[in-house]
Amino acid sequence: MIIGVVSGQEPEEATPSLSARSTVRWRTFVRTETSSAVFLLAAVAAALVWANVGPHSYEAVWQARFTVGFDTRRLSLTVHEWINSGLMSLFFFVVGLEARRDFDMGELRDRRWLLLSAIAGLGSMIVPALIFVLVNAGRESVHGWGTAMSTDTAFALGVLAVFGSRLPASLRAFLLSVSVVDDLVALLVIAVFYSDEIRLPALLVAVCALLAIALLRLAGVRGALYCAVLSVVVWVALHEAGVDPVVAGLAVGVLVAAYPAPRGDLEQASRLFRLFREQPTPELHRSAVQGLDAAISPNERLEQRFLPWVSFGIVPLFALANAGIELSGPALADAFTSPVTLGIVLGCVVGKVIGTVGSMAAARLLSGGRLRPNVGWGSVTVGGAIAGSAFTVSLLIASLAFDGAELEEARIGILVTLVGAFLTSWAVTAVIGLLPERRRARALLGDVDPLTDLAVPVDRRHDRIRGPESAVVTVVEYGDFECPYCGQAEPVVRDLLGQESDVRYVWRHLPLRDVHPRAQLAAEASEAAARQDRFWEMHDLLLERQNALAAPDLLRYAGELGLDVERFRQDLRDHLGARRVAEDVDSADLSRVSGTPTFFINGRRHHGAYDIAALTRAVELARQRALTG
């Protein structure tokens, strides 16, 4: 499933309890794509066992009807339909949220990459559909061509997580953007080719409700209630229009904007929390909670809220309801000689690779090289192979296109694609791993300059730099001497510099004065030490002794370092370092940095943990990119 990155570890002021450690381990587990893929596969296995041990009970459970409504307006669907058309709307909602976040803050900010991803998404659907049509030509089963088109986002990202650091992080953005195009087109295919007669009045209501959500978002109107009510209106209207309503989730998700937490909103949240701390009343509690919510983009809040339910509830439940197939020797033999099964397997496992690589190569050729993937062709091939995993949407289309024996054959083919996609992507990754280092880096990363997030480049005449000037990799940290997270990160950075000889480190000041009252003075103290050529010694000492940063403490540290204490005292009194600190703060604003620590590695913002393993992986990726330059 689609999982947000894990934030930096929390500083430990005391030994955590067993329950606290268990909670942390659980949260870490649920925030990985691998764990959600494990749940998905477990649900598939459970469905297969249930369908073969108790086939009658399996069918009875999912065909039971559930009705909602009042008076003459009632909606009666089977449990199977509620899951496929109702709960799965939330799955596509989360897909839409992450796609929008990547559009606003990630790789898709480069609109050329967005266009190329759309081309790759279309190519990776057209070729598999054509293969299915060729295999089923002249048969009634040819109308099920849509079954071979779609990629299962949950499984694809889970497979990508299994390969881990062997593949570039930007491949995830590529897979996600292709998957969104895939899902959009697949849902349009469902609406046009596999839905009942479309009723235009109800469809118009759905479009108007979507426009209302978009306009309210543009107007900056906050609040989950109106969005939830209008989303339900969209879903019901699409159902009444004869269109599979799962498209509602994706459409609403891409309308929810993502953005970094603005500094002003964070400072307001801190002020409201301090007021609550002084007077813990229900009214101030409500204000503090609202202030915290306002500081985080609705995109991130909604994904955080829905992601665990989707990853570990809805998607496995969908698999349990749809993957139950009665397996027997004759049934399997019939399936593997069936044009339906063969069309799906060949279309997904082979056609996805051909369609993805071929469409991107054609786009590069026809554009004269202006449209180039921001990953290497090896990564593109792996992405195409991983995209061959068909499950969620393919099962939806199969349930609409087939029945009886053909439906069972389609389900078997869809399950086979999961194994085929994994084995194919593993084989391609293994071959790439055998290449010499420089060729492997180019195959994985390509030759396109990555997007730069750091607005103000490193200047050796201005910045505080530790490490060789000729270093291949530059790590920039925006930090606060009173921030406990920065204190936790400092030994990690020192370990990184100790084990990586071609890395240099840059410290830039970002004192969070609203929560750390001594941070500004500490930053100025480090600059006063820099005027006596002892910046890094003072830097290390301040982060080591974060709980003692008052003016007398700073003067004592100056004495310990052998500085001219009177000169140091006068520099602090005159605030000679304030201008330099303000320049760093201004550069942080330009780079949309609002919290500490924030790391940039060769100009790219580092998202995720800042333990030694995570930073080492990020540095290695930056080094490989430098090798391809």
From Swiss-Prot:
Report the transmembrane regions from the record.
35-55, 77-97, 115-135, 144-164, 173-193, 201-221, 241-261, 306-326, 342-362, 382-402, 412-432
Which Pfam families does the entry mention? Na_H_antiport_1 (PF06965), Thioredoxin_4 (PF13462)
- Thioredoxin domain location is 443-624
| Membrane association type | Multi-pass membrane protein
Give me any GO biological process, just one. Answer: regulation of pH
Tell me where it resides: Cell membrane
Highest taxon above the source species: Bacteria
Keyword Cell membrane in record: yes
Reaction(s) catalysed (UniProt annotation) = Na(+)(in) + 2 H(+)(out) = Na(+)(out) + 2 H(+)(in)
Q: Region entry Na(+)/H(+) antiporter NhaA: which residue ranges?
A: 1-442
Main localization category? membrane
Q: Which Gene3D superfamilies match?
A: Glutaredoxin, Na+/H+ antiporter like domain
Keywords assigned by UniProt, alphabetized = Antiport, Cell membrane, Ion transport, Membrane, Sodium, Sodium transport, Transmembrane, Transmembrane helix, Transport
Keyword match Lyase: no
Q: Which InterPro entries match?
A: Na/H_antiporter_dom_sf, NhaA, Thioredoxin-like_fold, Thioredoxin-like_sf, Thioredoxin_domain
Q: Which GO terms describe its molecular function?
A: sodium:proton antiporter activity
Q: Per the record, GO CC terms? A: plasma membrane
Q: Which family does it belong to?
A: In the N-terminal section; belongs to the NhaA Na(+)/H(+) (TC 2.A.33) antiporter family.
Task: State what this protein does.
Answer: Na(+)/H(+) antiporter that extrudes sodium in exchange for external protons.
What's the protein here called? Answer: Na(+)/H(+) antiporter NhaA 2
**Gene responsible for this protein:** nhaA2
